[in-house]
Amino acid sequence: GDLNIAPLAEDVWSTKQLRNVVSHTDIERENLIAMQERGGWVDAVRDFFGADERLYSWWSYRARDYISSNRGRRLDHVWTSTDLAPQIQKVEIHSNTRGWKQPSDHVPISLQLG
């Protein structure tokens, strides 16, 4: 879902510059991670791609050069139960949709289970 929080350093283009910006503040990040842990949820996107890869699902409309600058944030999430997580076969962040005519600033994420 569109949670509008980027919990990890790898979920933003610059954790240093965005630390005090809404969507990446300490209180937002800590609370989202705590909610995920309390619910026993698995971050399907991170589970599939790994913790170290920079991943984004949002780019500002103000950045006309969003492709080359890649100053994005991962604000959209797919969580699964721990039982369902082993069935994740494919996760795609459809960044190409950001280039469509009149796109959203968020891009879809799809999950394939098997």
Predicted regions and their residues:
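Active-site flanking residues adjacent to catalytic metal/cofactor-binding acidic residues
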Residues: G1-L3
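Metal-dependent phosphoester-hydrolase catalytic domains
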Residues: L8-G114
